Amino acid sequence: MPGITREEVAHLARLARLELKGEELDHFAGQLDDIIGAVARVSEVADQDVPPTSHPLPLTNVMRADEVRPSLTPAQALSGAPAQEQQRFKVPQILGED
Amino acid sequence: MTVTDLVSYEDALASYDPVMGLEVHVELGTKTKMFCGCSTELKQDANSQTCPVCLGLPGALPVVNEIGVESAIKIGLALNCEIAEWCRFARKNYFYPDMPKNFQTSQYDEPIAFNGYLDVQLEDGEIFRVQIERAHMEEDTGKSTHVGGATGRIHGASHSLLDYNRAGIPLIEIVTKPIEGAGARAPEVAKAYVAELRELIKALGVSEARMEMGQMRCDVNLSLRPHGREEFGTRSETKNVNSLRSVERAARYEVQRHAAVLSSGGTIVQETRHFHEEDGSTTAGRIKDNAEDYRYFPEPDLVPVAPARDWVEELRKGLPELPRLRRARLKEDWGVNEHDMQSILNAGAVDLIVATTEAGAPSDQARKWWMGELARNANETGRGLDELPITPAQVARVAALVAAGDLNDKLARQVIEGVLAGEGDPDTVVEKRGLKVVSDEGALSTAVDEAIAGNAAIADKIRAGKVAAAGALVGAVMKATRGQADAARVRELILEKLGAEG
């Protein structure tokens, strides 16, 4: 049975930029392991004739003509930004000092 | 930063065999972004071309741009790839401020095009086949401006500013299979491949592929292995190498650097490296994340793309002549040597010359003007030939006026100068500047008589049979007519009047 270890949860938390305390890692590792186990049961009933699916609707080729539509104004685009400068989104330092 | 020791290129090649992988990103020339209708026009106001989809706002639904898909298929076909019957987009998850969604919509294990090749011609004419692994669809990131550090670099910056106008512009990433067997010519192969790919993309009309504008960017992956070993060494990935010359230099530098590290008993770290135009060196960037850290998964907001076979075949039929074959054909037609053809190519003059001949000019005349006067002007004014305010049809008209004897070369140059200065089309410039060759025999005859009278000593020499002296009188007439006389006709008149045989 596939499962997930506490180390893997800690790794994923780091990738997702989530700060988890030790007891939270224990807690979520157990819960996630249960969930993965439950989902894995699907593959027990899915036989060769059932292809993996990523979309519930049997649709393909939904495309859009290459025609320009109005964009937001810069003010609208920036309205949710915690900080802005020179009509741009302002973000904290990307690289730490090294 | 420490100075990296290098071994000489020859020594590196004596011990090691280079293996390369090239990843090229091409920004498509679509009017709108890959998954939304925002304009892709360059140099617009910051954040004036964004919407909920490309900003990744909750609830926004992307829809794929059909020209984006069509362009990807055309590129795939031109690279002799198979086109997927069915493929999906995938989310590549990572946190970086240039991607407002916190994931890039890309393709993972189901690229739209795969398993192809591109034949490239090296400088000595040898054809080298570069195998293509895949070409897939994805989207560009936003543009960062780093504030507070030295010369805009990310190192030492206090904060960064983001403009998302570019975020979501369609990109096609083209990945080669490992390029083996190029040996010492690996850097040359890398350059020739990127050059050929650029020509191909332009010929397909899917992008202008201007490297200096970031419309085409290359990553050079390189590793060395000792001669005789099958297994690849650890590779470095030099990012954003953005000119043909830099591609060659980056590959060469990495060969020398790897060899220095390996032969001193060190190990190559798998990392991204930054290329520096100033001295052709590379420096370490971040240690590469493992692929699984991107946690790719199928994009649930987009449905699969399943290109109908008849559509694919229709696109295949519409493919243009391959640039390499077209070049060979034109070289033959024009009767030029490899070196001249290369100069024409480097100057970006091929299409202009073709258009000029199509407008009626003989190819030697079209070449002469584009590679001479016009190339000089473009060079002096820091423009591309295609940016000059003169059309191939106008150049053809100038050539026609010369052929008809209405202009001589000197006057033709003045006409071109006038057209470039915005004075109008060639006929208008001729009219306004009064540049017609003086073909009025009466006026010419008078000018010749005056020249003879004013240079009696020279005239005597010519009468005595010293025909070569006629040049001085021709010069005098040309001066008197401000260059507007037909020099050959002037010479004839002089000899005739002085009773000398030409």
Swiss-Prot record, chain A:
Source superkingdom: Bacteria
EC code: 6.3.5.-
GO molecular function, one term: asparaginyl-tRNA synthase (glutamine-hydrolyzing) activity
GO biological process: glutaminyl-tRNAGln biosynthesis via transamidation; regulation of translational fidelity; translation
InterPro entries per the UniProt record, alphabetical: Asp/Glu-ADT_sf_sub_c (IPR036113), GatC (IPR003837)
A Pfam family hit: GatC
Swiss-Prot/TrEMBL keywords: ATP-binding, Ligase, Nucleotide-binding, Protein biosynthesis
Region (Disordered): 75-98
Catalytic activity from the UniProt record: L-glutamyl-tRNA(Gln) + L-glutamine + ATP + H2O = L-glutaminyl-tRNA(Gln) + L-glutamate + ADP + phosphate + H(+); L-aspartyl-tRNA(Asn) + L-glutamine + ATP + H2O = L-asparaginyl-tRNA(Asn) + L-glutamate + ADP + phosphate + 2 H(+)
Disulphides: none
Described purpose of this protein according to its UniProt entry: Allows the formation of correctly charged Asn-tRNA(Asn) or Gln-tRNA(Gln) through the transamidation of misacylated Asp-tRNA(Asn) or Glu-tRNA(Gln) in organisms which lack either or both of asparaginyl-tRNA or glutaminyl-tRNA synthetases. The reaction takes place in the presence of glutamine and ATP through an activated phospho-Asp-tRNA(Asn) or phospho-Glu-tRNA(Gln).
Family, as annotated: Belongs to the GatC family.
Subunit structure: Heterotrimer of A, B and C subunits.
UniProt protein name: Aspartyl/glutamyl-tRNA(Asn/Gln) amidotransferase subunit C
Species the sequence originates in: Streptomyces griseus subsp. griseus (strain JCM 4626 / CBS 651.72 / NBRC 13350 / KCC S-0626 / ISP 5235)
